[in-house]
Regions:
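Residue signature of alpha-solenoid helical repeat architecture, marking inter-repeat boundaries
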Residues: 55, 91-98, 132-136, 172-175, ...
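Residue register of alpha-helical TPR repeats
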Residues: 97-99, 135, 139, 179, ...
Length: 270
């Protein structure tokens, strides 16, 4: 076997590695890959090791969470909470704590209760602390948008773009980040927080340039129309947003077209 000192030499300090092992520190992808190489473990082998915890995969959790939220299923949310609580006690993995925080805030929302800032702060502190954002951090941020204070959302959106740049060539990453930016724009417009939106539109357009993600391109255009409308360029903004709704009807998405129209109607002739 290899000691912690032998494994970490020249890559990270021994105290850092010990804290990482206990879940008290995050590590950059570059250093993590170097550690795997030092241990003669391929990334594929690492994935197989992770597969041992397939029953506890984040993907499975997110699918169940989505089902619960779409159906306003409080019973399922409570069951998910109990499951994640058991997993946190068993594995002491921070993701289970993050999941518990997210679930508890949605339970509060459905019960008409206030959010819990001290819990949400654990998620924002984690996001500020991580040096490189991967899929986990992007999804965590996206799933926490309803709870994070508005004044922190724009700052975290800049961090999300900058700290995930290493993955900018990945189509999956581009798709995930563009969806999250779209959700951020929606949240900021909904809360009438228009400062900095223009920069987010530029970032989204740059991300989506050259892609075939027409649905997301159309959504960004829709929000841009509302932004222009609210900023005083009424006719142009209204035309752009209505064109986006028309495209949805052409794409045979009348349900989404109605949802967009209802959102737009809130800003017409205010």
């Amino acid at each position: 076997g290899m000691t912690l000192e032998e494994a970490s030499k020249g890559i990270v300090s021994l105290p850092f590695l010990s804290k990482f092992e206990r879940g008290e520190h995050e590590i950059t992808s570059n250093k993590f890959i170097r550690l795997l190489s030092r241990l003669n473990i391929s990334y594929r082998e690492f994935e197989l090791i992770l597969g041992h915890l397939e029953g506890y995969s984040q993907t499975a959790f997110l699918q169940q969470l989505s089902t619960a939220l779409v159906n306003n299923d409080l019973a399922l949310l409570n069951q998910l909470y109990d499951d994640q609580k058991i997993l946190l006690k068993q594995y002491s993995d921070s993701r289970f704590e993050h999941n518990l925080i997210i679930i508890s805030q949605y339970i509060n929302l459905l019960n008409g209760l206030s959010f819990e800032p001290h819990k949400i702060k654990k998620i924002t502190d984690y996001l500020y602390r991580v040096e490189e954002w991967g899929e986990y951090e992007l999804v965590l941020f996206g799933n926490s948008l309803n709870f994070i204070p508005i004044e922190k959302i724009y700052n975290l959106s800049k961090i999300a773009i900058n700290r995930s740049a290493i993955f900018s060539k990945s189509p999956k990453h581009v798709n995930e980040l563009s969806i999250i930016i779209g959700n951020i724009i929606h949240t900021l417009i909904e809360n009438e927080h228009f400062d900095g939106l223009n920069n987010l539109f530029i970032q989204a357009e740059n991300l989506l340039s050259g892609t075939d993600n027409f649905a997301e391109i159309n959504r960004i255009n829709f929000y841009k129309g509302i932004y222009l409308l609210v900023q005083g360029n009424y006719d142009k903004g209204l035309s752009i947003s209505q064109q986006a709704i028309s495209i949805l009807n052409q794409m045979r998405r009348p349900d989404l077209a109605r949802e967009y129209k209802d959102f737009l109607d809130q800003y017409i002739e205010r």
